[in-house]
């Protein structure tokens, strides 16, 4: 057998994958090749079950495609764990066959590059004896983390750059950098993905770390259960024994006094022991209704970062990544159509793309701009009836207690100019209006004035907490 396939495969995957993904998942594999009776076989050994599962779910298909490309025939792939003492049960071998061969469905691989129109080979998993669950796998399950939510799979842009940078710093130095890390933003903007990515990165670096992701409602249920079963000592021991606590949607703590009391003491115990706490919320800490002041003050001990609605380019990138995961080809004009008309959150973007894909498949048509417009006609119609600049101007004027006429005036005093700039920024972000059209609506101003206003607000938000808070509140009000 030609023994050069694995080096060939490594070289190709290194070109196709981000360096971090390649080093973490592919470079750690050990390969053995054989060609018994003319059947080409490749056995890959993963260092642990976590890597094994990740490679099987995301990269096995692509390795099989490269094997068929190199050898000119389907190859048999086997993925296993190292033999230690007693013989380990290998993962079920996977044979790569041409399309049309009998077998099961192809595994999705969002990391693989787009494939040609020819049907790709399918991975057929042979039945095997159930494998024993390892201690590492059980430990990971207890974290309640989602293995799909990693820094690698997170689309980044201006909307989440600061939050991502802070999250990566926490992942590299848990308990010492930004404790607690408080991430806030609207629904569907990727807060949960980001905090899972922190947990996954920490666990991958040190599987001995005791990590727990918990939604606030589950934490509340744990408190109620401890109260009913009179087991508060066990409850306290568990939560205070964690190395990292990730708690999602803390706004739902409102008016749950006993739950807040228990979390307050757990928070103190963990931070004093330099254990990391990560929190998400849909609003800035001081705006949470029904939350004790002593908790809010402790959230200020670390770092508070906001995730904003994604900008146009980021929305397009999110759609293309989702299309890649769905293994469908989406032209830029289709992605731009969806991205221009859906501005609020990632879930809406992905939902719209799913609708287009389903519509195209149901009607037996390819995904085109015309098909996308047909599939989303109700959504596009609703969008066209959305915010007007006049409504934005009135809302901002009421908020800052100035006159709507001031939006059109030539006054340059700070109390007038800043709200006007905020209104221009909101008009650019929340409506499809062009810069010249926005300028015309603000007293016939030039488009360069609008551009300057938008850039000013964007830059000021990074350092001016009050302005950032104002823009966040106005955005939420205008979106209803």
From Swiss-Prot:
Ranges for region Domain I, interacts with DnaA modulators: 1-73
InterPro entries xref list: AAA+_ATPase, Chromosome_initiator_DnaA, Chromosome_initiator_DnaA-like, Chromosome_initiator_DnaA_CS, DnaA_C, DnaA_dom, DnaA_N_dom, DnaA_N_sf
Ranges where the record places region Domain IV, binds dsDNA: 361-480
Entry's transmembrane regions: none
GO cellular component: cytoplasm; plasma membrane
Chain segments carrying region Domain II: 73-143
Any one GO BP annotation for this protein: regulation of DNA replication
Disulphide bridges, residue numbers: none
Domain III, AAA+ region, as annotated region: 144-360
A molecular function (GO) term: DNA replication origin binding
Keywords assigned by UniProt, alphabetized: ATP-binding, Cytoplasm, DNA replication, DNA-binding, Lipid-binding, Nucleotide-binding
PROSITE patterns: DNAA
Positions of ATP binding: 188, 190-192
Main location: cytoplasm
Family as reported in the entry's similarity comment: Belongs to the DnaA family.
Matches recorded under PANTHER family: CHROMOSOMAL REPLICATION INITIATOR PROTEIN DNAA (PTHR30050:SF2)
UniProt-listed NCBIfam families: DnaA (TIGR00362)
Protein name as annotated: Chromosomal replication initiator protein DnaA
Gene from which this protein is expressed: dnaA
